[in-house]
Amino acid sequence: MIKKFIDKLLGKGAAGAGKHRFGKREEVPASVHGINPDLVDRRASDVVRTLKQAGYEAYIVGGAVRDLLLGLKPKDFDVATNATPEQVKGLFRRAFIIGKRFRIVHVVHGRGREHEVIEVSTFRAYLDNTAIEQQVSGNEKTSKQQLSGMQHAVDASGRVLRDNVWGPQDEDATRRDFTVNAMYYDPETQVVVDYHKGIQDAKKKLLRMIGDPATRYREDPVRIIRAVRFSAKLAALGFTIEPKTAGPLIASQALLSDVPQSRMFDEMLKLLQTGHALATIAQLKKLGMSKGIYPLLDVVVERAELPFVHAALADTDRRVGEGKPVAPSFLLACVLWQDVKTGWDLRLAQRQHPFPALQDAIDEVFNQRIGDVSGRGKLAADMREIWVMQPR
């Protein structure tokens, strides 16, 4: 039902909506793009060099290239290659294949708190979901057994459930979300490979979706959240979201109801814990999306102007900016303390003993607001510890 409703709203089937557009390869030299090679992490360059010496293609990719073009030093460096995960793993002493939905390799440099992880992904094919034979019912949570042995699978709504079909670089670029995140940089030749005018958009400071935005949101509804997150993150640098990219966001929002709760919870934390929580809330309001993405996020947005909550959000942004760790338990405990306090006061008015009354109020709020998410046990314990300290 949701798929049909969204299709009607977005006009699925319009001419050209399903065409493959792999873009035209442009190799842009250093004299044009102006990237300062001193901003490139040596460990990322070493990973690229090792892969190339083994006969593979390899590039720094994604947001790191965007930041380099803007003259910024990236916090994280990802590498893309035509080597398979198994081939990548065989080239490095400390490399680990992770993920099932998207199989990637973590190449680890250093140890302890000083260690650095370079994420290496294999070029992936761009597959038109209308041509996929491996269509399954259910969603990411209910179709794990059905996905066994599949390299690429989608559900009836067109959402990608598994994406491990390797392909050429041009298709890998097309399957990425935004033009400014779909460029490839070779630190040895200092050439940027650009298929979708990403350099041009970076100079214009424009966040633009690759392909038809409505179709891309249908393929993976979490792209809706990423559009908000990146537009908020890049707003501080003067970026604006392209109207065609922003246009279908509200109409596509209902697609998020099919995404498993644990994944939605994780995506919400990314919105709030990547150093741009206040900017994200402002962007949600600007886009008319302050409600309806995720119930707990609705509460955060609603209470963001309360001094206690605003201070917690601002402190989280500050700590991320300073490279310090942040904990979801602290931020969520601040946001939901109002509910716990109300429930506790109600129980005290009924002459319940203070400590058991507080514990009951905590249980009620956690079950209602957080629900069944991955990592629930530790999160609950940490939030409980914070809340129990408040009456002291």
Regions found by a protein language model. Name each.
Residues 1-392:
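Catalytic cores of the polymerase beta-like nucleotidyltransferase superfamily
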